[in-house]
Amino acid sequence: MAKIKPQALLNQSKKKKGPSRISISTIIVCNLVVAVVILSLVTTYRHWSQRSRNTIEHETRSQRFEDTNTASGQKTYDLPGFADINTSKGLITVELFKEGSPEVVDKFLDLCQKDHFKGMPFQRVIKNYLVQAGHSPSSIPVEEWTAKGKLRGRLHIGPKHEAFMLGTPKNKGNNKDFELLITTAPIPDLNDQLIVFGRVLKGEDVVQEIEEVDTDEHFQPKSPIGITGVVLKLET
């Protein structure tokens, strides 16, 4: 048997252990697979990124819409509809006619928040007619009040001019002259001068107690009576 030379064995060993070559087609296929995977990842990222941005924008628009509606609703629907008028004789609770006299009610609410009525005196009390509070002399002369009072029994009584209605004279030029009047009898003939914007719900007895005070010849109370504060309420 022929012996293999050491050099031949070494050469055979090198041939067996040598790495096998990778074909060009295999390399191309691997590169294509990697490219497809990367492209898929990029596409997926862009899709979810755009979806996330759209969601955020939608939520932002929705929040702005809700905020706008909330602000609008506060002015339209959530305005106080009642007020507690605290006087030196007791508490008078009134309902405000927000729909019937919106501009006057808005003005009244604004003045309440500024404490305009705090300390306001009842400057005129006409028995079986009305009580009036204000910081300045009334724009309607006493003679006109009393003359109209004599005629009230002959005129048609409207629902807004019954007893215990809350009103203010028309044609008041500024806030400091804003007066409060509460009728103690039907006054159907003052549509041309009186704006009715509320009615007494509780405290008619307090109004009547104010009505019974002693007055001078100008219908001014001999003893000071006034409003100590007004508290606005959404409900009674």
Curated annotation (Swiss-Prot):
* Stated family: Belongs to the cyclophilin-type PPIase family.
The protein's recorded glycosylation sites are 86
* SUPFAM superfamilies noted in UniProt: Cyclophilin-like
One GO CC annotation: Golgi medial cisterna
Main location (coarse class): membrane
Q: Where are the transmembrane segments?
A: 22-42
Entry-linked InterPro entries: Cyclophilin-like_dom_sf (IPR029000), Cyclophilin-type_PPIase_dom (IPR002130)
Cysteines paired by S-S bonds: none
The protein's superkingdom reads Eukaryota
Which gene name belongs to this protein? Answer: CYP21-4
Record domain PPIase cyclophilin-type: where: 82-232
**UniProt entry tagged with the keyword Phosphoprotein:** no
Read off the lineage from the record.
Eukaryota, Viridiplantae, Streptophyta, Embryophyta, Tracheophyta
Q: Which Pfam families match?
A: Pro_isomerase
Tissue specificity annotation = Ubiquitous.
Induction per UniProt is: Down-regulated by dark treatment.
State the name under which the record lists this protein.
Answer: Peptidyl-prolyl cis-trans isomerase CYP21-4
EC numbers listed for it are 5.2.1.8
Where is the segment annotated Disordered?
A: 52-71
**Gene Ontology molecular functions:** peptidyl-prolyl cis-trans isomerase activity
Q: What class of enzyme is it?
A: isomerase
Q: Where in the cell is it found?
A: Membrane
Function recorded in the entry: PPIases accelerate the folding of proteins. It catalyzes the cis-trans isomerization of proline imidic peptide bonds in oligopeptides.
Give the membrane topology.
Answer: Single-pass type II membrane protein
